[in-house]
Regions:
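Short amphipathic alpha-helix with an adjacent loop that forms part of the alpha/beta core around
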Residues: 133-143
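Segments forming oxygen-rich coordination pockets for charged ligands
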Residues: 1-111, 118-120, 142, 187-189, ...
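ADP-ribose/adenylate-binding Rossmann-like module
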Residues: 107-109, 146-153, 162-187
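Short, glycine/polar-rich helix-capping loops at beta-to-alpha or helix-loop-helix junctions
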Residues: 113-118, 156-159
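Short glycine/serine/threonine-rich phosphate/pyrophosphate-binding segments
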Residues: 92-95, 155-160, 180-183, 265
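Adenosine-phosphate binding glycine-rich loop
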Residues: 175-243
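Conserved SAM-binding strand-loop segment of SAM-dependent methyltransferases
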Residues: 125-131
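Short, acidic/turn-prone active-site loops that include or flank metal/cofactor-
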Residues: 44, 111-114, 131-135, 153, ...
Length: 336
């Protein structure tokens, strides 16, 4: 189950899962792709997910979710964000530089060969020359992708937007005056794209911080990207936990499914204890982590344990500011 999740995460950069936490189907888990639920257990429980697809597909946060009388833990995994800059002009250079500083894999594409050189973009991971009509052929689809359209005209803008809106993405922004943006929108509406699709485009691009210099515009653009990137609560991948999964370790996966107060790790944080007692990852250290490690060998199948950090209980568990943490224990007899 987790190996499949991490495999698809490596390919797409983003995965959404949901687990049932109560009732007769407790422990059943699915992956949500293209608004459809795909069972990660067996085909016998595939049908039950159809009743929940709409609500699960709409959920954008890692969190607990009630649908009717059924409780779910929805988890959004993200990894390796890609910044794809379409247009190699003067604004693109500082955008690429800042994007690299922020931890993005950076791609720059332009239809002019002399505009996409290593001298102009020393921080880029990938440089592509070609027509903007070739985006689908030259740039693989990737869900955790942030597209910045900064071409020199509305024809280039519409060529880029036309292809990007037919693929998954996390962010799509387009530079230009309001008139240029209006022309592009009208052209795309005439081609059959809907207002709903076009409203996903950040245009004009960037936060309204003022400034006309290329570097100032780049700060505006990347600030909006960071804002969008941090808009939802997601689960960031612990490399040690992923390594244990890939090595098919048997043991217990522990995940924070809810928290309040001052607990140091957020919802979705994971750690894994293998059968030999070796720990991978962390859910925040201290006595909470110690108590979870102590309980893990006794866990049976799918189990939730609540650690009360309020008042004296919090002091005993190393969280004197109070709060509460719920930890999900999943017994992994053979990681698959």
């Amino acid at each position: 189950m987790y190996r499949k999740i991490y495999q698809i995460l490596e390919e797409t950069g983003k995965v959404k899962t949901a687990m049932i936490l109560n009732g007769i189907h407790k422990g059943a888990k699915c992956m949500i792709r293209e608004n459809q639920c795909i069972s990660l257990n067996d085909s016998e429980v595939q049908e039950l997910w159809k009743d929940y697809e709409k609500e699960l597909a709409a959920c954008q946060d890692t969190k607990l979710l009630w649908i009717g009388e059924t409780e779910f833990f929805v988890e959004i995994y993200v990894k390796n964000p890609q910044l794809i800059i379409l247009g190699g002009g003067h604004v693109s250079q500082p955008v690429a530089k800042i994007g690299k500083m922020l931890g993005f894999h950076v791609t720059v594409m332009d239809d002019r060969e002399d505009f996409v050189t290593a001298e102009r973009f020393p921080d880029a991971d990938r440089l592509i020359t070609g027509s903007y009509d070739e985006i689908s052929e030259k740039i693989p689809a990737y869900e955790n992708a942030y597209y910045v359209i900064v071409t020199r005209g509305h024809l280039g803008d519409s060529a880029c937007a036309r292809q990007i809106m037919r693929r998954p993405y996390t962010y799509l922004g387009m530079i230009g005056s309001r008139n240029k943006v209006k022309l592009t929108r009208e052209k795309l509406l005439g081609e059959g794209f809907t207002e709903e699709q076009l409203n996903t485009i950040h245009a004009p691009i960037g936060l309204p911080i003022g400034g006309n210099m290329p570097a100032e515009i780049a700060v505006s653009i990347t600030a909006e990207i960071v804002q969008e990137k941090n808009r939802y609560s997601v689960s960031y991948i612990d490399e040690a936990v992923e390594r244990a999964v890939r090595e098919k370790k048997e043991g217990v996966m522990m995940t924070i499914i809810s928290k309040s107060g001052s607990s140091p790790r957020g919802t979705g944080s994971k750690m894994f204890l293998d059968k030999k007692g070796k720990l991978y990852g962390s859910i925040g250290g201290g006595n909470v982590e110690f108590q979870a490690m102590k309980h893990a060998p006794e866990a049976t199948d799918t189990e939730i344990v609540k650690y009360n950090l309020s008042n004296a209980g919090g002091a005993n568990l190393g969280m004197i500011c109070g709060g509460q943490v719920e930890v999900l224990f999943e017994v992994m007899k053979e990681l698959s």
